[in-house]
Regions:
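Structural recognition of the beta-propeller blade-terminating site
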Residues: 27, 195, 258-260
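Short, surface-exposed charged micro-motifs
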Residues: 157-158, 191-193, 236, 245-246
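A short, polar/proline- and glycine-enriched secondary-structure boundary/capping micro-motif
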Residues: 46, 179-182, 212-219, 258-259, ...
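Core segments of small alpha/beta cavity-forming domains
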Residues: 3-23, 33, 64-149, 222-263, ...
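Surface-exposed, charged secondary-structure patches
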Residues: 3-8, 20-48, 52-69, 137-182, ...
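Short, well-ordered strand-loop elements centered on a beta-strand within folded domains, enriched
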Residues: 167-171, 199-209
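Short, solvent-exposed aromatic-acidic interface loops
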Residues: 85, 205-215
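A short, surface-exposed beta-strand/turn
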Residues: 181-205
Length: 301
């Protein structure tokens, strides 16, 4: 919360009519109501609602609180939850600006060399873009031979605020055209641990993970292998007893491959077939495979 005690909030409506907006501030366990109010002043433009929430002078400094934003749409209530904190001299805004600039620079081949001051001893694996840290080469941090573009604007999330450093995570989607001429999409998460001083910013830690959103195109099968693209080595999968049918999870989607029929099928997904939607591509979507029988029927949660 800044000195003006106004919290800017933007909501994507996705063509949902909003009749009323209100908010609550509660203790982190949600048991104690600190403040609540209706939002009467807001603007709506091109499917975006923008508002500023006045935060009353009722918060204890350096204590986290639960903020609940409530939208009324007809007979439905829509809730958004986040945490807020009033902290002096935390320099969160400056750290977010630094993180955004660092991210921008990794995509700019002419400026990428300026990041060398933050690099550490090169001991990381420079053969993959799936996991990149400051221990990789500068070339790897600046995306090596991957000439993709950011499909979505990186969204910063403040995970930790301490007297000595702040932790900020960026989430976004990159895309490029693969060798088969089809668009490929990748979820990217960047973890930054940053220290602010009056003279410079210190990047204490940087980790980037990259996971391909599997599309199941014709070239996804090669011999006895399913080519999942750039992703971690830890694959959630099961096979039936004969090993002829395998089911696996990739970025919140469940897939099944029948080796005898040489068919690959998407069993369950929140995503559509065109583009990437923020709601469908929500990072907390997950699937756990329970069982697969000999006929290829899958139990999952």
């Amino acid at each position: 919360i800044g000195e003006d005690r106004l919290l800017p909030v933007t909501v994507k409506t996705y063509q949902t009519a909003v009749d009323k907006i209100s908010y609550e501030i509660r203790s982190l366990d949600a048991k104690r109501l600190i403040a609540n109010a209706d939002v009467t002043s807001y603007t709506e433009n091109k499917g975006m609602i923008s508002m500023e929430l006045p935060i009353q002078n009722l918060l204890e400094e350096n204590e986290e609180y639960l903020l609940v934003i409530q939208l009324e749409s007809g007979d439905r209530m829509i809730y958004y939850y986040t945490r807020i904190i009033e902290s002096q001299n935390s320099y969160v805004s400056e750290c977010i600006d630094f993180v955004r600039q660092f991210n921008d620079t990794t995509f700019d081949s002419e400026k990428a060399a300026s990041l060398s001051t933050y690099m550490e001893k090169t001991i990381g694996d420079n053969t993959t873009l799936q996991y990149v840290t400051l221990n990789n080469s500068l070339n790897q941090v600046s995306w090596a031979e991957f000439h993709g573009t950011r499909l979505t604007t990186p969204v910063p999330s403040v995970k930790e605020i301490t007297p000595t450093y702040n932790v900020i995570v960026l989430d976004y989607v990159v895309t490029w055209v693969g060798q088969n001429g089809q668009s490929e999409y990748y979820n990217v998460e960047e973890y930054y641990r940053v220290r602010y001083t009056n003279t410079r910013m210190y990047l204490l830690n940087f980790e980037r993970t990259m996971e391909e959103i599997f599309r199941g195109e014709n070239d996804s099968i090669s011999g006895n292998s399913i080519l999942l693209g750039i992703r971690s080595k830890d694959v959630e999968y099961q096979t039936n007893e004969s090993g002829k049918v395998v089911t696996f999870v990739q970025e919140g989607e469940l897939w099944s491959y029948n080796q005898e029929a040489n068919t690959l099928a998407k069993v369950f997904s929140f995503r559509g077939y065109e583009g990437v939607d923020d709601r469908e591509n929500y990072g907390e979507h997950d699937i756990k495979i329970v069982n697969i029988d000999e006929a290829g029927s899958i139990d999952y949660i």
